[in-house]
């Protein structure tokens, strides 16, 4: 591993822990994503955060996701995350399930394996964090 990769891994570990420290399961390989999605119950809801090293992930996406997961009355059955740019195969596999234009950071909400709601980067970046929280809350209230 070169110095750049080591540095990015160190940063990603800290950024990943903002979610895993709040009970998000980190899916880091294509097999982990496939196994998780294959075994999810048809009535289970899964909130997916596609994490990123960018500023809008740090200042908006991760804090909004954590806030709503912790404070909303209706919650998804599962909370998982993949890390774009770090866990490339896992992210690509999750994007196969999402079937939307690749976007990071982003959020997806599934019921079973069916995508119910997707929030891409362009609906995160540059917006007020309260508005992002409301988008996530509305999706949870509708589908969880």
Swiss-Prot record:
Gene3D superfamilies, A to Z: Glutaredoxin
GO annotation terms (biological process): cell redox homeostasis
Organism: Staphylococcus saprophyticus subsp. saprophyticus (strain ATCC 15305 / DSM 20229 / NCIMB 8711 / NCTC 7292 / S-41)
Protein name, per record: Bacilliredoxin SSP1311
Family: Belongs to the bacilliredoxin family.
Superkingdom of the organism of origin: Bacteria
């Amino acid at each position: 591993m070169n110095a750049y990769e080591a540095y990015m891994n160190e940063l990603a570990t800290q950024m990943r822990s903002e979610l895993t420290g709040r009970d998000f399961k980190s899916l880091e390989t294509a097999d982990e994503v496939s196994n998780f999605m294959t075994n999810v119950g048809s009535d289970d809801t899964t909130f997916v955060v596609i994490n990123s090293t960018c500023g809008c992930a740090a200042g908006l996406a991760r804090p909004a996701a954590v806030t709503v997961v912790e404070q909303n009355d209706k919650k998804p059955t599962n909370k998982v995350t993949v890390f774009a740019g770090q866990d490339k195969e896992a992210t690509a596999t999750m994007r196969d399930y999402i079937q939307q234009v690749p976007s990071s950071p982003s959020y997806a909400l599934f019921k079973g394996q069916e995508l119910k709601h997707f929030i891409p980067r362009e609906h995160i970046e540059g917006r007020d964090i309260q508005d992002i929280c409301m988008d996530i809350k509305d999706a949870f209230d509708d589908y969880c």
